Amino acid sequence: MSLEPDYNPDFNLGMRTEVQQLNQVLMSSSTGMGFIMLLSGEPGVGKTLTAESVAEEMRQPLYIMSASELGETAVEVEEALEQVLELTSKWNAILLLDECDMFLEARSTSDIRRNRLVSIFLRQIEYYRGVMFLTSNRISDFDPAFESRIHLTIHYPALDIQSRLHVWKTFIQIGHLETKIRDKDLKALAKLELNGRQIKNIVKTARLLCKQERVPLAMEHIQMVLQVKKGSLL
């Protein structure tokens, strides 16, 4: 099953609705059976946030691991995967394997080494009985063998101006702290082609600046961070 979520005018509501739908799918699946979801899209569009929100809603710990940490050889990947899957099963944790593109890409006859890695990865996840999220930065050229092992695929489109506006609002309003940032400032910020992770980090750094100055968060703090990160002011 494949989904492509629409961005809700209310960013928080959209995320809550999506998480509730995922929880319903998980609860309706067979007890004791594994459930694997693929979250695909550019960095910073909400893939990790989705897994974090589902884990929070289900009140289960979330174990996050980058696929690159599994190793490079077949032996390393097999041993690392066995350990991670055993650990998450003991903890009753949800597993998030980040950036799995190297395993998800279609195999070719010219790369025997990589074919072995993919085969091991497929075999290990096939017998997993927990909830697993796989993330990918692209959706094309998947190995056909994954179609029968991935139960749900969600593709996240790149953020547009309206989506970025709500992301800015969401992170700036976290904690309901005092701010001098106005709607026209938010609209100007939304025109910058930044992803959700970049926006989150910019706001976090700006909050540290205003905390040091003991003043409300203002556009000047955001501009200062942008100047350092991008070399230019708005």
Residue ranges of model-derived segments:
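C-terminal engagement/docking regions of AAA+ P-loop ATPases
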Residues: 10-29, 200, 217-234
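Surface-exposed beta-strand edges and their flanking turn/coil or helix-capping segments
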Residues: 64, 77-78, 168-169, 204, ...
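A short structural micro-motif
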Residues: 3-5, 208-209, 228-232
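Conserved AAA+ ATPase small/helical "lid" subdomain
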Residues: 154, 176-227
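Walker A/P-loop NTP-binding motif of AAA+ ATPase domains
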Residues: 2-188
